UniProtKB/Swiss-Prot annotation:
It is an enzyme of class 1 (oxidoreductase). NCBIfam families: gnd, PRK09287.1. GO terms for molecular function: NADP binding; phosphogluconate dehydrogenase (decarboxylating) activity. Belongs to the 6-phosphogluconate dehydrogenase family. NADP(+) binds at G10, M11, A12, V13, M14, G15, N33, R34, S35, V74, K75, A76, N102. Gene3D superfamilies: 6-Phosphogluconate Dehydrogenase, domain 3, N-(1-d-carboxylethyl)-l-norvaline Dehydrogenase, domain 2, NAD(P)-binding Rossmann-like Domain. SUPFAM superfamilies: 6-phosphogluconate dehydrogenase C-terminal domain-like, NAD(P)-binding Rossmann-fold domains. This is 6-phosphogluconate dehydrogenase, decarboxylating. Pathway: Carbohydrate degradation; pentose phosphate pathway; D-ribulose 5-phosphate from D-glucose 6-phosphate (oxidative stage): step 3/3. One of its GO terms (biological process) is organic acid catabolic process.
Length: 468
């Protein structure tokens, strides 16, 4: 009896769509779900497909060619551990488990270590692109044993999104948790992108009172230039979508932005690594403060502030906001990739930053034209400390920083909250400062806690008795 080439555990929408994606490339796929009904539903809805259902873990595992390749698409956390534990009694040494969930990278490091000790291969794999990407081609970020990756690479390359140059959006990221870490930072960058766009929207509404049709036209024009990206593209569509009553849908959506925690993970990791991930962290905080709707409504009746004054030069202001958005985006990516470098050093992953940018070019939520500029920057100088120092990005900063400053100044003077746009210029100015006022902070630390300090004019470590 012939055996299937790969198995998928978890028939929720992402697992189902990935199974269908794999099947569409000519593979036979064993499918299993903890609840029998879900498996039966998938099979009933996809008659004629090379999906073979199994209703016990043992039968599912035994249906696969060896070394077995099993893709887990189950709820991250305890659900993943439970699924792995159910599989292990039936696996042979050398079999490969691929975790495609939104898993915290430290969990992936642990599972890789534990399964390796038992002779199994474990590949923690970031998958970006949502439901449509899973079905038609996502961006895929696998990390784990390199030799195990080579055994699943043919399948992953066939199901991945394809960039304009024909290259699949998948590459080996690095050992143990590297793939899930890169996916985590991808999600953090996604948070930053979305908040920057939301602030541009607030500025255009507050400063120019643009109609939804005008906003859509503006974003359509932006999408034809430097800002060309998936998120700008969908935003132009969102502005003009109406509900069944003829109302613009975006105008009646409650202004509370939810989150699944991956942005928080990125910010927490930045603190662990000592990385100034200020813009992305502000985007996480912006979602948190948006959730304080009742408090904000009450505060709006108590706390005073300026009323936004209309801007005279409409075209000029739109261009300033566009430039501020693009430079803010560059700062966000500079912070994100700087954190990838710090993590690579900390966890010995030897990440290839140019390759990472390349696999973001299609399939994923942050896909954008300018990602090629990041790949180019690392091709020119693989050891560059920060993307802001690369010639292209330095030139953009030279040309666009005044617009960013003007937009932030307008927002502050007119009471429009722009936490990520503000964070962008604060980071830029801090990073370009040869001298910061941290000398005073270090003096304070030595004053109250004898934490010592270094001097600019002498070698060594010093402590002063400040009250003598």
């Amino acid at each position: 009896m012939s055996k299937q080439q790969i198995g998928v555990v978890g028939m929720a929408v992402m697992g189902r769509n990935l199974a269908l994606n794999i099947e569409s490339r000519g593979y036979t796929v064993s499918v299993f779900n903890r609840s029998r009904e879900k498996t039966e539903e998938v099979i009933a809805e996809n008659t004629g497909k090379k999906l073979v259902p199994y209703y016990t873990v043992q039968e599912f595992v035994e249906s696969l060619e060896t070394p077995r390749r099993i893709l887990l698409m189950v709820k991250a956390g305890a659900g993943t551990d439970s699924a792995i534990d159910s599989l292990k009694p039936y696996l042979d040494k050398g079999d490969i488990i691929i975790d495609g969930g939104n898993t915290f990278f430290q969990d992936t490091i642990r599972r890789n270590r534990e399964l390796s000790a038992e002779g199994f291969n474990f590949i923690g794999t970031g998958v970006s692109g949502g439901e449509e990407g899973a079905l038609k081609g996502p961006s895929i970020m696998p990390g784990g044993q390199k030799e195990a990756y080579e055994l699943v690479a043919p399948i992953l390359k066939q199901i991945a999104a394809v960039a304009e140059d024909g290259e699949p959006c998948v590459t080996y990221i690095g050992a143990d948790g590297a793939g899930h870490y890169v996916k985590m930072v991808h999600n953090g960058i996604e948070y930053g992108d979305m908040q920057l766009i939301a602030e541009a929207y607030a500025l255009l509404k507050g400063g120019l009172a643009l109609s939804n049709e005008e906003l859509a036209q503006t974003f359509t024009e932006w999408n034809e230039g430097e800002l060309s990206s998936y998120l700008i593209d969908i935003t132009k569509d969102i502005f003009t979508k109406k509900d069944e009553e003829g109302k613009y849908l975006v105008d009646v959506i409650l202004d509370e932005a939810a989150n699944k925690g991956t942005g928080k993970w990125t910010s927490q990791s930045s603190l662990d690594l000592g990385e100034p991930l200020s813009l992305i962290t502000e985007s996480v905080f912006a979602r948190y403060i948006s959730s304080l709707k009742d408090q904000r409504v009450a505060a709006s009746k108590v706390l005073s502030g300026p009323q936004a004054q209309p801007v005279g030069d409409k075209a000029g202001f739109i261009e300033k906001v566009r430039r501020a958005l693009y430079l803010g985006k560059i700062v966000s990516y500079a912070q994100g990739f700087s954190q990838l470098r710090a993590a690579s050093d900390e966890y010995n992953w030897d990440l290839n930053y140019g390759e990472i940018a390349k696999i973001f070019r299609a399939g994923c939520i942050i896909r954008a034209q300018f990602l090629q500029k990041i790949t180019d920057a690392y091709a020119q100088n693989a050891g560059i400390a920060n993307l802001l120092l690369a010639p292209y990005f330095k030139q953009i900063a030279d040309d666009y920083q005044q617009a960013l400053r003007d937009v932030v100044a307008y927002a502050v003077q007119n009471g429009i909250p722009v936490p990520t746009v503000s964070a962008a210029i604060a980071y830029y100015d801090s990073y370009r400062s040869a001298v910061l006022p941290a000398n005073l902070i270090q003096a304070q630390r030595d004053y109250f806690g004898a934490h010592t300090y270094k001097r600019t004019d002498k070698e060594g470590v010093f402590h002063t008795e400040w009250l003598e």
